């Protein structure tokens, strides 16, 4: 099967006829290769009836953004080692990487949640995008904080790089990275402070246009969708201006039943694509969104976050049964439009990037 357009929320198969399995993902263009790459969490074995949360990090390649060839697992799981952050029972999410010009390394950051208790980063590096990757830090707690969903960005003008991450469940942190991108310097700033679920901001997604910097963020409601927000700023550690919900005509308040995970700038065009996971493709999910949010509000009423320093502890070494069948998750890719400096997103049943 081949494609010649995007059909958001519909089944999307690779060139082998299998569902694309790369969630919590990054998409980018490699000018030298003339290829787009897409990497993310492989959920093919996550049925909701076993101990498997992920099955490694999978890579795809494409020349047209519609048809994707499976390049295999660039970071495989380690099912025989419960002391490894990559054991499939641990919640490995949102693999994101930066290429470090100074070291010539591809630096991959992974969010890990072990036993619903400890959230941290595992940081790996490789000489090639395809790997093999080796650990720099198996368990890394930036600024002695727990860390949830995150985004990475390297500033082309200054050479500095940054990580944006949720400090569960009450702050969004922006921290400056070390020169080799494998840790933080200690410089950081706090944003969206004091919110509690479902309003706590997670799934930060950075992009920039016309000298302005932006973050899409989601609320906190597990795999159930919720309204996105977008903010704008000039200084990474300065004031973030909240621009509200970017989604126009989204009556369900669910980001069109999806969660944005990255923004792709199409080369040689003023076109930005909001790329999102549709974790629950069932038609009735948006109908439950407000009910789920109200339940989260009740559950977290009076929540007092633990702000004590977090130490790096060994993994629990215990398998956890997972109830979510994310092997059926799909994708929603939509073009970003502009109302002045505000990015907005409208639903399209199908569309072609060449026509915009």
Language-model-detected regions and their locations in the chain:
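Carbohydrate-active catalytic/glycan-binding domains of CAZyme proteins
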Residues: 1-356
